[in-house]
């Protein structure tokens, strides 16, 4: 998002409508310009953002930490959007010393006039954005860099196996609209009608997720195989009780009290899998939402709870 005015993100009917990502190139060995190379591509993220969080998890699952450097924006978003203010725990922008993420967008396209979103997959060879759509970036991380991944065990990790693709695509489509984006449509609604409609959809989505996990033959959504669907849902669910319940008014229920199978799945991923635990920063998450969205929380007070953020496994 590029500013703090929530009403600017909603339509006149009070509904929040997510912007379509505009940079959609794909890295591949066969691409004319964007081939996989070590240290060429840089990932710009926010630890607060669930969409960017997906890319951090897959980067770690695939052993790309020494292939694709990461740069983190600060947790506080002001009128100029995401920034590289180190007082807000940013790493800074070592490539260009940019003050704001928007500077990268204008470097890639001087006429860019949309929101300045994360994640951003940046090409330091051509000084441009390759892709800013998280769903496509995690697919690239899953298979496009295999030839430069040194760890054999991580190289063979496949989060989008051919045998499960139909089911993965089906679940992704359903849960994107109801849960992943549903919490935003609820929280950024500017009319009671829009809020009430969307919050019900969120909990319908959670009900289905609970059932999918109840029927699963293994620890993950699709049995014994960790897939991108687990990753995509984790980044929303891990934020649900700490932020979305109170900040986005998704308070018909909580994960820990009303969804035992989701809660068990969440605890297992968070406490047993370093790629999930080590990329989850609750300071960034809580402070960003509660102190950046001033029209939702004008006093900028960040709640202490829940304690713990994720129940112990």
Swiss-Prot record:
InterPro entries: Glutathione-S-Trfase_C-like, Glutathione-S-Trfase_C_sf, Glutathione_S-Trfase, Glutathione_S-Trfase_N, GST_Omega-like_C, GST_Omega/GSH, Thioredoxin-like_sf. GO terms for molecular function: glutathione dehydrogenase (ascorbate) activity; glutathione transferase activity. One of its GO terms (cellular component) is nucleus. It is found in: Cytoplasm; Nucleus; Golgi apparatus. SUPFAM superfamilies: GST C-terminal domain-like, Thioredoxin-like. Keywords: Cell wall biogenesis/degradation, Cytoplasm, Golgi apparatus, Nucleus, Oxidoreductase, Transferase. It catalyses: RX + glutathione = an S-substituted glutathione + a halide anion + H(+); L-dehydroascorbate + 2 glutathione = glutathione disulfide + L-ascorbate. The keyword Chaperone does not apply. Its EC number is 2.5.1.18, 1.8.5.1. The active site is at residue 49. Residues 161-289 form the GST C-terminal domain. One of its GO terms (biological process) is cell wall organization. Pfam families: GST_C_2, GST_N_2. Active as '1-Cys' thiol transferase against beta-hydroxyethyl disulfide (HED), as dehydroascorbate reductase and as dimethylarsinic acid reductase, while not active against the standard GST substrate 1-chloro-2,4-dinitrobenzene (CDNB). May be involved in cell wall organization and biogenesis. PANTHER family: GLUTATHIONE S-TRANSFERASE OMEGA-LIKE 1-RELATED, GLUTATHIONYL-HYDROQUINONE REDUCTASE. Belongs to the GST superfamily. Omega family. This is Glutathione S-transferase omega-like 2. It comes from Schizosaccharomyces pombe (strain 972 / ATCC 24843) (Fission yeast). The gene is gto2.
